[in-house]
Amino acid sequence: YSFKYEDLINGLLLDGASLPTVDSELNIGDFWTLRFASTTSQGNVNFNARTAKVSVGTRFAGLYSVIEHDYWRIGVQRSDVEWPDEMVVESVDAITYRVVEYFGAFDNNEYYFQIDSNDRITYPALTPSGDPQVGNNEPMTNCDSNLTDLTNVPCGDLSNLVIRDEVNGKDQLVMTFGYYTVEGASGAREFYQVLEKIVD
């Protein structure tokens, strides 16, 4: 299914006013939630149970394949842990991104990162709503703030960077982060992943 911006705004009002005629006047992070309906030959309308989200994004928003990964649990490499094949990265604003669903290999999570003008990746201490960043409900760690908790995965110049692909658009996000469990099996969980943008 394909559409243009004009299709999305046709007949749509927001607070009684039409949306801008050009998408450049929208804010990064603005979105539509599309609900699909089909009409039978008898005229019955049936709605699909699933929806699709269309958002105003930036270059690095999109669907990524996981092309490399490494996970260490309390100093022990865990190559047996399955990672997802793909991850969704959403734009929050011009420099902030949200990874939907996964924190490394673990689902039912989300986290935020930022890309600066030098294509370096950092992880803000707080989410856009002001809550502390967590992974699996534990404090998030990163190379800048918790280097001693990330000794088995790359930090420094070899990680937390963007590799731009100006020819094919298959940009890569090279990321190192983790979380620290305080109670129970306490200790660092360390993640390294390389995500490559999927281009149609």
What are these regions (language model features)?
Residues 1-28:
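Signal that preferentially marks extracellular ectodomain short beta-strand elements
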Residues 4, 39-41, 180:
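Solvent-exposed residues in well-ordered beta-strands and their adjoining turns
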Residues 20-21, 47-49, 158:
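Short structured motifs
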Residues 25-44:
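Internal, hydrophobic beta-strand segments that form the core of beta-sheet-rich folds
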Residues 36, 50, 97:
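A broad, low-specificity signal marking well-ordered, structured residues that form hydrophobic/aromatic
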Residues 41-48, 186-188:
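Short, exposed coil/turn segments at beta-strand boundaries within extracellular/luminal domains
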Residues 44-61:
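Short beta-strand elements
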Residues 56-200:
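Ser/Thr/Gly/Pro-rich, low-complexity flexible regions
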